[in-house]
């Protein structure tokens, strides 16, 4: 009986511990089949204050791609991200990054106005931009992409956000338009804290 209790307890604890570990998803597989892990890099990005964006040690980041004129998925994504940011407002180690995919239109003043409309402090949520080429390369590091529609008035892009850990590795992807995915994101944020 004692052995059975120990076996059950061991199984429970090992299952419980394994669910707390999040995989590192930022890697590429080389020709030999080996995983090459990489960190997210923000060299060349500027925030809504016109300052170079730099990731801070000890912070985790919820990161997405958007554009300020987006008429489709960006407004509901923004609403959900505002709600999540409000929930973690007091935690200085949880930050938000939104990359514009329309750097020609989304100037620093436009990003600043967009940021102010969220009601979330600049110190919590950074809206960033870079050259079109740099933004496309950044999207690739996040394993996503975007492209303009036929007349160039809109972009096709994802409703997923990424969770980036304190070491600048991607630890998860979440569709913030799905309630269960938002709940999973919140749990995973807590796991990394």
Language model features with spans:
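Sec-dependent signal peptide recognition
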Residues: 1-7
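C-terminal motif of bacterial Sec signal peptides marking the signal peptidase cleavage site
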Residues: 11-14
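N-terminal "domain-start" segment that seeds a small globular fold
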Residues: 20-57, 76-79
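Short loop/turn microsegments at loop-to-beta-strand junctions
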Residues: 40-41, 60-61, 158-160
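Short active-site neighborhood of thiol/selenol oxidoreductases, capturing the structured segment around
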Residues: 53-81, 97
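Structural microenvironment flanking redox-active thiols in thiol-disulfide oxidoreductases
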Residues: 78-138
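Thiol-/selenol-based redox modules, centered on thioredoxin-like
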Residues: 149-193
């Amino acid at each position: 009986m004692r052995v059975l209790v120990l076996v059950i307890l061991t199984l429970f604890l090992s299952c419980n511990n394994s669910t707390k570990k999040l995989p590192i998803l930022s890697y590429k597989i080389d020709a030999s089949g080996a995983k090459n892990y990489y960190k997210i890099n923000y060299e060349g990005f500027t925030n809504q204050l016109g300052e170079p964006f730099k990731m801070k040690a000890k912070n985790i980041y919820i990161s997405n791609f958007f554009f300020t004129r987006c008429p489709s998925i960006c407004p509901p994504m923004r609403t959900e991200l505002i709600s999540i940011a409000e929930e973690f407002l007091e935690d200085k180690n949880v930050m938000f990054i939104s990359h514009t995919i329309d750097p020609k239109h989304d100037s620093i003043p436009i990003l600043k106005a967009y940021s102010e409309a969220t009601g979330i402090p600049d110190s919590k949520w950074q809206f960033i931009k870079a050259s079109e080429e740099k933004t496309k390369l950044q999207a690739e590091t996040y394993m996503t992409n975007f492209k303009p529609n036929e007349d160039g008035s809109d972009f096709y892009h994802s409703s997923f956000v990424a969770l980036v850990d304190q070491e600048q590795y991607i630890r998860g992807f979440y569709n913030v338009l799905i309630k269960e995915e938002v709940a999973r994101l919140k749990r995973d944020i807590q796991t990394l804290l």
